[in-house]
A protein has these predicted regions:
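Short acidic amphipathic segments
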Residues: 42-60, 134, 172-181
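Short amphipathic alpha-helix segments
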Residues: 32-48, 118-125
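A short interface-forming secondary-structure element
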Residues: 23-25, 33-34, 63-69, 145-164
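Strongly charged, low-complexity linkers/loops
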Residues: 107-157
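Conserved small/polar residues in nucleotide/adenosyl-binding loops
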Residues: 185-191
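N-terminal presequence-like segments and adjacent domain-start helices
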Residues: 6-32, 76-77, 84-118
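Flexible helix-coil linker/hinge segments at domain or subdomain boundaries
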Residues: 86-93, 170-183
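Charge-rich, low-aromatic oligomerization/scaffolding segments with amphipathic character
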Residues: 69-86, 157-160
Length: 198
């Protein structure tokens, strides 16, 4: 098995390409080891010293490390953990479906939200996935779009610029009802996240 690696715009995050499917659909974000209990792959990666986050995509894995840990020391152990996982035949996530990022939408906002999601899915998410991350929609309220940045995008030094200059400008250009785009910080309780977005 040959695993390629790619750097990301976030110097604390590295993208691993195992050459096979990681998740059949969706993405999975594990910002800490406690959240990784449903993923044998993420658990193995959190077992490597200095790992602070794991993100799984369709055909890639991104790993975020502490600043004090050097990639030259962590990378061989991470490659070994990924190889061991795929050779074991285990699933990346135990019997769990990809998370559903849909939110309740008022009837008057349904068309706008549909346009927002279409632009995110066709223009934004593919570009962000190339950098080892993802952006998910979490709400639209009075002109404000709420998004969550995951994987290499979470904590990336250029994430604010991506959000404001890239995504916000794109959405405002095509959808005049959009006035602002805000990023939600990671909150482990999804019901609390939904309350913040609306």
């Amino acid at each position: 098995m040959f695993i390629q690696t790619e750097s990301t715009p976030n110097p604390a995050t590295l993208k691993f390409l195992p050459g096979q499917t990681v998740l059949e659909e969706g993405t999975a974000d594990f910002p800490n080891s406690e959240d990784a209990s449903i993923s044998p792959l993420a658990q193995k990666l959190f077992g490597v010293n200095g790992v602070t986050g794991v993100f799984l995509g369709r055909d890639f894995v991104t790993v975020t490390k502490e600043d004090s840990v050097d990639w030259d020391h962590a990378k061989p152990a991470l490659l070994g953990a990924i190889m061991e996982h795929f050779q074991s035949g285990q699933e990346a996530i135990n019997g769990a479906a990809a998370p559903d990022h849909s939110t309740e939408v008022s009837e008057e906002d349904a068309q706008i939200v549909g346009q927002i999601k279409e632009l995110l899915d066709s223009r934004v998410r593919p570009a962000v996935a190339q950098d080892g991350g993802d952006i998910t929609f979490h709400g639209f309220d009075r002109g404000v779009v709420y998004l969550q940045m995951k994987g290499a995008c979470a904590g990336c030094p250029s994430s604010t610029m991506t959000l404001k200059m890239g995504i916000e400008n794109l959405l405002r250009h095509y959808i005049p009802e959009v006035t602002e785009v805000l990023s939600l910080i990671h909150i482990s309780d999804p019901t609390r996240l939904r309350r913040i977005a609306y």
